């Protein structure tokens, strides 16, 4: 599964590569002017790739991370 930024802002990741995730777990946060939105896992799995560095700028639709099979 590929996880994308919902809108432009600064991304902060809360997981590491190799970490197991569960449905609804908060993976990252995207922060824009006075707005902070959690990015949650759509299903169980293992983080296989983090495509952005912490506190980097993203635009809506940018790849944040990938989740593989659980």
Predicted regions and their residues:
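A structural signal for short beta-strand/turn segments enriched in small hydrophobics and glycine
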Residues: 18-27, 55-64
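Short alpha-helical linear motifs
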Residues: 48-49, 66-69
């Amino acid at each position: 599964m590929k996880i994308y930024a919902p809108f432009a802002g600064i991304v902060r990741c809360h997981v590491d590569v190799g970490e197991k995730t569960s449905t609804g777990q908060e993976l990252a946060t995207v922060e824009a002017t006075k707005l902070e939105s959690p990015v949650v896992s759509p299903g169980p799995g293992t983080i296989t790739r983090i495509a952005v560095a912490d506190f980097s700028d993203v635009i809506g639709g940018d790849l944040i991370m990938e989740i593989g099979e659980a």
